[in-house]
Amino acid sequence: METYPITIGKITRHVPVVETLPGVHIPLVEIMGDVDLVQAAAEGLLKHLPPETDALLTLETSPIVLAHSISALCGKPYVVVRRKRRPYMQDPIIQEVESLTLGVSETLWLDSRMAEKLMGQNVALVFDVVSSGGTMTALEKVAKKAGANVVARLAAFHQGNSKLPVTFLSEIPILQTA
């Protein structure tokens, strides 16, 4: 199996290269379960967290561990936006997003009770990997609908040509094959 080296701080991993679309391969970064990599990313991103940040905003599933680790380091709360509607949700904020990297459209959901926690807050968006920027753009729209002000866009890894200004720790390629 072909692998690609990724590094955050002093932590290096060799991750598998997978095909996402015909002729397009990416290093598959899955941070869940890798405590050392998550901790290194949290420590690295914490250095870029603006002092005016009140809360972190992330989405399920993979970036939760990163947001949790940053939260534990800085004492700021975090809110998780869901990728599926949950039965308990009341009057949720709904935002469509298309992930160009994986070619799959999805919907983001934020329960109104969670949205209330963001009202008037300065939030930092936390991601594991940002590629096209489509999902992060949708998350920013959720934050604004909830009445929050986005003060930072943070990601452990950046991949591709996102036009968004994102603070990231490491770059990973999109590999094209003929």
Regions found by a protein language model. Name each.
Residues 1-53:
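Active-site-facing substrate-recognition patch
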Residues 5, 137-178:
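PRPP-dependent phosphoribosyltransferase catalytic core
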Residues 53-60:
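Short glycine-rich phosphate-binding loop at a beta-alpha junction
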Residues 54, 121, 151:
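Conserved acidic residues
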Residues 60-65, 132:
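Gly/Ser/Thr-rich loops at beta-strand to alpha-helix junctions
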Residues 61, 83-85, 156-159:
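Short, ordered loop/turn segments at secondary-structure junctions
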Residues 65-74, 140:
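Short Gly/Thr/Asp-enriched flexible loops that form oxyanion-binding sites at enzyme active sites
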Residues 76-123:
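Short, glycine/charge-rich flexible loops or terminal/linker lids adjacent to PRPP-binding catalytic cores
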